[in-house]
Every structure is written in C-alpha cells, then in structure tokens.
C-alpha cells in the first residue's frame, strides 16, 4: 500500500524508515535555517520533534523563513511550525518550548530523550552551552554556522569545526570549544566572505522596528542587522536535515 513516505522508503528501506519514525529530534531555533530543517525532517518521516524558540514571526521574516506568511506574523514560531508539521504528517509528535535555551534552563529540556540535536541558534553563548550539553549527554549534534550576509549557497559544506575557515562565527566557536576541551563538532559552514550590509539600510531597519508586540528579539536591541535572502538559509537547513537523516539510519 502506498503511503506519503513510499518514495522515501524506495531510497532508504523499511528498517531506516522505522528508525526515523521512532526518532526524536530537537531543533533549537525555528528561523531561516531551523524551519527548513523541520520541514525536510517531517517530510522524510522523523516521528517526534522538540521545537525550541521564544520568538514570534516578524514581517522581516517573510523574505526567507518557511513559516512566515502575512497570516502568521505575530504568532510564535514554534506554534506555526507545529501546525505546519501536523498538516504534513498528522501522526507526528511535536513538543514546543517557547523559550530561549541557556545554561540555567537546560534542566527544563528532556535531553535524555533526544536522539539528535540541531543547533540553529545564532548567539555564541547559547550555541556553546548547547554543544556542551549535547557532549555531556552523548547526543549527536550538528551546528549551523553563519548563514547571514551571504549570497552563494553553493559555498556551504559539512565539516568538523576545526576544519572550518573564513566564517567569523566558526572562528569564535573553534576558539571557545577548544578552551572547553571539545574535540570535534559537525557543522555546516560557508567559505564565502561575509558581505557587508548597506549601512544606511541597517540603520533604518534598527530604528524603524516593525517587530510584533511582545517580540523577544527586536531590531532596536540588536547590535547588527544581518542581510539575508531566501536561497541561502534554506539550503543550510536542507543540508543539515540530510546529515541528520543519514546519521540516524547509517547502520540500517
């Protein structure tokens, strides 16, 4: 009998599909990268998710985020993503956490139940804390490096953090993880030199914030406004999703 996953099963096989159905993946931050991770994984057959993000959909998200439409502006990203995932697969299990991950609230997450962690966070402190928690719990993790201020999606690749170059975020992560004794970390990063945003536009975006009421990360509070396009973070998210699937089923 045909199912919505029949064509995927042609490639992966039944054992792998069963593995994915029984897997629980935590995606930290449901933005330009994380949204496409969720989209690809639910369409591939992953059976359970934890979505972690304290932000709401903003009008400026419409240029790149899969959950962003005129109708979803002002809604929590986790709730919008959950609704979309259930429309794709009504049997998927989705837990949402409308909060931002930090070391002090790590105890609030069921890490012991996660089979894989996706780090799509864009702040160094939270990224490092998440990586350290994953290493402590021996949970596979993949981290997204900088996807903003870039135009060439073909420059992204999968590598160990200590094999990366060019990316400013990866440079900081290498330094901080080395201090903490982390030996390896799978990441997706780009060798493209970051493009400097048009200065007067960045100032305008920050000073004329149109974020929804109650938004936790308003433009007026950001040190820098990164430029973005639809065809870059989406590719990063799809690359990450592919790595998650391949890792989960590699011994099937």
What label would you give each PLM region?
Residues 27-29, 52:
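Conserved N-terminal Rossmann-fold NAD(P)-binding element of oxidoreductases
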Residues 33-34:
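Hydrophobic/small residue at the entry helix of a nucleotide-binding pocket
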Residues 2, 21, 109-116, 121-126, ...:
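Glycine-rich phosphate/adenylate-binding loop
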Residues 1-26:
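N-terminal charged helix/coil linker that caps or initiates catalytic domains
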Residues 57-60, 148-153:
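Short gly/pro/ser/thr-enriched loop/turn and capping motifs at secondary-structure boundaries
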Residues 98-106:
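Conserved SAM/SAH-binding loop
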Residues 46, 51-89:
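Glycine-rich phosphate-binding loop and adjoining beta1-alpha1-beta2 segment
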């Amino acid at each position: 009998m045909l199912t919505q996953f029949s064509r995927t099963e042609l490639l992966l096989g039944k054992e792998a599909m069963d593995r994915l159905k029984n897997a629980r993946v935590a995606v930290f931050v449901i933005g330009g990268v994380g949204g496409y991770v969720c989209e690809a994984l639910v369409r591939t057959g992953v059976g359970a998710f934890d979505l972690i993000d304290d932000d709401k959909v903003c009008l400026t998200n419409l240029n790149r985020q899969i959950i962003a439409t005129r109708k979803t502006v002002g809604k929590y990203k986790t709730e919008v993503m959950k609704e979309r995932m259930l429309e794709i697969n009504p049997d998927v299990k989705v837990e949402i956490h409308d909060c931002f991950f930090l070391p002090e609230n790590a105890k609030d997450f069921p890490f012991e139940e996660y089979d894989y962690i996706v780090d799509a966070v864009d702040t160094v402190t939270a990224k490092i804390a998440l990586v350290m928690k994953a290493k402590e719990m021996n949970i596979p993790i993949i981290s997204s490096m900088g996807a903003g201020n870039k135009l060439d999606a073909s420059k992204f690749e999968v590598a160990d953090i200590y094999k990366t170059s060019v990316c400013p975020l990866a440079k900081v992560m290498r330094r901080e993880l080395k201090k903490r004794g982390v030996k390896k970390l799978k990441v997706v990063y780009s060798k493209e030199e970051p493009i400097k945003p048009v200065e007067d536009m960045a100032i305008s975006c920050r000073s004329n914030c149109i974020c929804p009421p109650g938004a936790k990360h308003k433009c007026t509070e950001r040190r820098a406004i990164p430029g973005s396009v639809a065809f870059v973070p989406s590719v990063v998210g799809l690359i990450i999703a592919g790595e998650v699937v391949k890792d989960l089923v590699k011994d099937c």
